[in-house]
């Protein structure tokens, strides 16, 4: 995962990200779809993107807050837009077209409700704060603002990755219909993401002509 830069949506341009030069701590806030089941059932207190941004600003008043909205919200297909007041007060900058893997090496923290990006960030060595109760919280790997009481024992990151990606799921090659290993899937997704990025770049160049 670290080597190939594969993420959940496997979309967004993979290119260098230039962090802000204001000297402040860089906090990445990852948006989700408001009303999503994972928020309704897994985030008992903070339940919208706007509430998340206000909470993060209150918790990190001096930080540079970088907000990445959910791709479906950016496309206008799902709920989760942020008011102008919240954007002005809570957000220092936004990123819309870059993949998360371009951002992870540069951020000091990632804050989210229940997004899978928190798990990805842990794998990439980023400090993660959860405002909900996703599966990767409560094991001593994240800072949890609203922890799940039933999770009491620490778990090494390697164990969490193994249980999440190897022991629990089964993978099928969507091209052949045959079983495949997690490593095979990662390589295939990486190749697909690279191909999609090249196609997008060609389309963007054509539009500029």
Positions of predicted regions on the chain:
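Catalytic-core helical/loop segments in enzymes performing group transfer/polymerization on anionic/lipid-linked
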Residues: 1-209
């Amino acid at each position: 995962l670290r080597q190939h830069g594969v993420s959940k949506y496997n979309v967004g341009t993979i290119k260098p990200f230039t962090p802000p030069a204001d000297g402040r701590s860089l906090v990445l806030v990852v948006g989700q779809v408001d009303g999503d089941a994972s928020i309704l059932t897994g985030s008992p207190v903070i339940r919208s993107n706007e509430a998340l941004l206000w909470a993060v600003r209150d918790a990190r008043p001096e930080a540079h807050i970088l907000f990445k909205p959910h791709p479906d919200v950016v496309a206008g297909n799902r709920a989760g837009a942020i008011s102008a007041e919240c954007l002005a007060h809570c957000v220092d900058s936004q990123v819309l077209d870059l993949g998360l893997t371009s951002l992870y090496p540069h951020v000091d923290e990632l804050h989210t409700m229940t997004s899978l990006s928190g798990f990805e960030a842990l794998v990439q060595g980023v400090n993660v704060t959860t405002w909900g109760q996703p599966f990767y919280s409560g094991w001593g790997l994240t800072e949890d603002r609203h922890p799940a009481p039933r999770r009491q024992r620490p778990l090494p990151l390697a164990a969490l990755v193994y249980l999440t990606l190897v022991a629990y799921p089964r993978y099928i090659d969507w091209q052949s219909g045959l079983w495949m290993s997690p490593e095979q899937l990662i390589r295939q997704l990486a190749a697909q993401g690279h191909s999609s990025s090249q196609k997008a770049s060609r389309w963007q160049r054509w539009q500029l002509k």
